[in-house]
Design a protein with these regions (language model features):
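N-terminal alpha-helical interaction blocks
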Residues: 2-91
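Cys/His-clustered metal-coordination modules, chiefly Zn-binding fingers
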Residues: 87-173
């Protein structure tokens, strides 16, 4: 059967990740959820959802699924946080900073798209913040991954160019 066949077996439904199934992502989501709790009163913590891959598996392949950061009801927005195993990467990042960057970015996408609001907000300037490595406050950051500096929520500031690091991810409270 080819992947375009109408006889293709149905995909499994997305499901919440089992405890311990994705330990690095679970640990980093706990950090991000501290910011969710501190900045969105009444918002329950985000969860990890696992959806089956829609692509055919390679011979002897194991489908561990695609991992998304989701609202408590299971809805998510954005890309999966786990690696494409066909490229030979490990399922979870080897370092905590990369995992934190992936999970915090996915959490921001999910919250902003599903709650229709900027998140998180700089209390000084009343604008949405961006995720980036600490100490790169000069201006817009090209998005290069820099695992030597911790991830922070960064504010573009006002029109006078007063951009600044606001807080380490997980410490907005």
């Amino acid at each position: 059967m080819n992947s375009f066949s109408y006889d293709r077996p149905p995909l499994q439904e997305p499901r919440p990740a089992e405890p311990g199934e994705w330990p690095e992502f679970e640990a980093t989501l706990a950090v991000v959820n501290r910011d969710v709790t501190a900045t969105l009163p009444g918002q329950d913590p985000l969860i990890l959802m696992v959806a089956p891959s829609w692509q055919p598996l390679p011979p002897n392949g194991i489908d561990r699924g695609l991992v998304f950061v989701a609202m408590p009801d299971g809805r998510w927005q954005g890309n999966a946080v786990n690696a494409d195993l066909e490229e030979g990467d490990p399922p979870e990042p080897d370092d905590a900073m990369t995992a934190l960057s992936l999970v915090a970015g996915a959490a921001q996408d999910t919250i902003m798209e599903l709650l229709w609001q900027a998140w998180p907000i700089c209390l000084e300037h009343k604008v949405g913040m961006h995720l980036r490595p600490a100490g790169t406050t000069d201006d817009w950051h090209g998005g290069e991954t820099d695992t030597s500096n911790p991830e922070v929520w960064w504010c573009r500031g006002s029109r006078d160019g007063t951009c600044h690091d606001v807080s380490l991810v997980g410490e907005l409270g």
